[in-house]
């Protein structure tokens, strides 16, 4: 079963491909190594707050837009682990 969509998939399918922007061109434009963009696209690297600010500037969006997508993805991934993370914790 496929996991939920990643921020990198959104970046590639909804932004880079439709706008005909290569990963290398985006990397140059936002001042990061091409490998950083490629690893985000492949789901091997998270979008950090500094990267979210860069992406927001590049796509003329909120600074927090991409970070918000990353946080949502992180919480969806953790949903499977919720029981083990909260086992033995009693609410105050």
Question: Across the structure, where does each feature detected by a protein language model lie?
Answer:
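A short, Lys/Arg-rich alpha-helix, primarily the initiator
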Residues: 1-21, 68
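Short alpha-helical "recognition helix" segments of helix-turn-helix
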Residues: 24-27, 55
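Recognition helix of helix-turn-helix/homeodomain-like DNA-binding domains
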Residues: 31-47
């Amino acid at each position: 079963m496929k996991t939920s969509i990643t921020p990198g998939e959104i970046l590639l399918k909804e932004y880079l491909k439709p706008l005909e922007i290569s990963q290398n061109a985006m990397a140059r434009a936002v001042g990061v190594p091409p490998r950083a963009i490629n690893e985000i696209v492949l789901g091997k690297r998270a979008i950090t707050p500094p990267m979210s600010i860069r992406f927001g500037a590049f796509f003329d969006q909120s600074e927090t837009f991409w970070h918000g997508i990353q946080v949502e993805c992180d919480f969806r991934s953790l949903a499977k682990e919720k029981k083990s993370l909260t086992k033995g914790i009693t609410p105050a």
